[in-house]
């Protein structure tokens, strides 16, 4: 999938540069056997950057793009309504794409998409799934990881659930949180440790968008660093206005 669909204007738009890089990195970095190198991807990004569109695109790539039979892709979040946000964007992408709409069956009442050529599905899970086991997971889209009340759902969906698949992907995407006891903070710290060379895990991919300690928050360069879609999904005038207001406080 080389493009996303703008669900508000119903016009096709190109991937934003940062979105394209993430897609290329995750799906284009392969092991010698031809399967994906990365099993876990952690993306931390502020609101209004195109997070849901990216997550929906990844879900559809996992559903339709790998050519594997009977793949199971799940949408998870702190509650079903949150997980439904990404699903709804994916539904719009399917409806506005003739190639997908011919091949994907939409079951809105079940929050489920079925890719008919391989009998694969993408489904939103309910909150009580943390008490269940037995998933044969090809992909998990974990939205707003920082809102998880504990690590139970994360563990159920990532520990052993994809062992029978050749290239499972756990795609974790979230805005920043502040609970240092959460699973999100644990994954965030792992991402920093790998980035700084303190840990090594070739199966783990991460991108964190945000200002570092000591950055000048009044600098447009820092605004762009923390908001990769600045000027596209986020108007620069709004950021300027917010900055000026903050200076007065």
Model-derived features: where do they sit?
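Phosphate/NTP-binding elements of NTP-utilizing enzymes
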Residues: 1-249
